[in-house]
């Protein structure tokens, strides 16, 4: 009996030893490059490579001119707005305009976050007057229109005090030149510290309304944690802690008929829409307006948005290195996906049927990586054929 137990124990030990030997004897090799992998979508073309300051915005005019902007966030920025000419970026409209006037914040360009061509021979420059995300300089946050025929400034609209808060960061804009005697512009406030909002301004008078102030649709999703390249994007929190980056209403697009405004907070995966008729009507209360906003569901986390003349809406998806397209029937499809699309930022549709967009590795900035700047130059302006025209503005 004793011998039987010993024999059984020896057999068990032998089997275990053999299994262990087989396990340790297995040979591991580096994963072959030929192993099944994520497949890119869309044929991307590089329009320009940036080896200096990081760009955020791009716009393509009705004649094909391309403008970009460089906010003053810490990089060396000799000019905050430029035009790509003959393969180089040059200050626009000139170097002098790109310098802050300390005596008059409403004069020179301080820190431009967005550039948008209005389809009627002008390019508009959106000046945050908030370098480094500081509080905007009093009287400095403004819209500047440049005539494309003369390359001269033809209009300055300083945002009135009733729409600019201490934490305001005007981010992006869209124009409807059919509404009002000279048109209407819609601007997102993507505040990092205060309430988000949509600013509605009459171009003729400069009169402005602050709408959806602090509404759920313009605010940071409190449960949202952005994950890019497999890593949570964190910023400074209270008492030296780190917390998910919180940026309010950012991307914006206007439907081809001007009746619907699409928008989304950067720190959210939802797309929202509201009727511009209600947005422009000061008699509609904030509660009524907030109740009229449509939540169109998840689209991925976006920085920039854009709309085409066929009724589609395009949205960057920075967590998945992608651009998505919402068809008029509400269905979504991915039109571009590539591991090199590190943070698709602003989108713009050119007259050539291409979707142009900036890729700038925004999430690799030092303030999101405990002081370590992980960006690798160049940043890129890319384009993708979509066979669609931009949504009309007039």
Cite the ranges covered by each PLM segment.
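Loop/turn-rich, solvent-exposed surfaces of beta-rich toroidal or solenoidal domains
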Residues: 255-267, 273-276, 291-332, 338
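Beta-propeller domains
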Residues: 68-98, 134, 148-149
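Short loop/turn segments immediately following beta-strands, especially the blade-tip
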Residues: 203-208, 274-285, 386-390
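Asp-box/WD-like beta-propeller blade repeats and closely related beta-sheet repeat scaffolds
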Residues: 133-188
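Beta-rich, blade/repeat-based domains predominating
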Residues: 51-63, 103-126, 163-185, 195, ...
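Blade-loop segments of beta-propeller domains
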Residues: 87-132, 136, 155-163
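Beta-strand-rich domains and repeat architectures in extracellular enzymes and scaffolds
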Residues: 45-79
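Conserved beta-strand positions in repeat-built beta-propeller and related beta-rich domains
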Residues: 66-75, 117, 125-128, 185-192, ...
